[in-house]
Amino acid sequence: MDFIEYFKVPKAAKIIDVGGGDSFLVDHLLALGYEDITVLDISEVAIDKAKERLGNLAKKVKWIIADIANFKSSQKYDVWHDRAAFHFLTEKKEIQNYIDATKQGITIEGILIIGTFSEDGPKKCSRIDITNYSQDSLNNLMKDSFKNVKSIYVDHKTPFNTVQNFVFSGFKKI
């Protein structure tokens, strides 16, 4: 939410939450009056949990069950939010497909917000290999179509009392 507030995203903006499944971003966006929200996740179970939690509010959200590594958007979004889906892509082709999807799926001047495990973060997530990033490595991947506006490193404390270091970057499409 900090990046969405930082970028002063208008309430009518088209927002997609990639890997949003059962996260609470959609709850916060709805509570703040955002009107055009899409949640994409590979897990139908996670999406069903979010729908159940939201009750009737779930009808205000577009839900997409898809693998982001092969996703081709049929529309353009003003905000593409991804907290920790991108780092699950470990193959060059998957990473390039994702970057191509952002280029195609985000409006000019649109916003790309990505959070991944940093280079100091865990090397696996839920026992699955991931790709770690730094602010510079994310910038290098996105530089052809996006300008970095803000990056921060954040220590996230898990329910298991461990700390995971993330890098969050906000980009504008150029």
Kindly give the residue locations of the regions a language model identified.
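A conserved beta-strand element that flanks and buttresses the S-adenosyl-L-methionine
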Residues: H81
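Short, conserved loop/helix-junction motifs that constitute active-site signature segments
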Residues: Q104-T107
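Class I (Rossmann-like) S-adenosyl-L-methionine-dependent methyltransferase catalytic domain
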Residues: M1-Q75, L89-A101, I111-I174
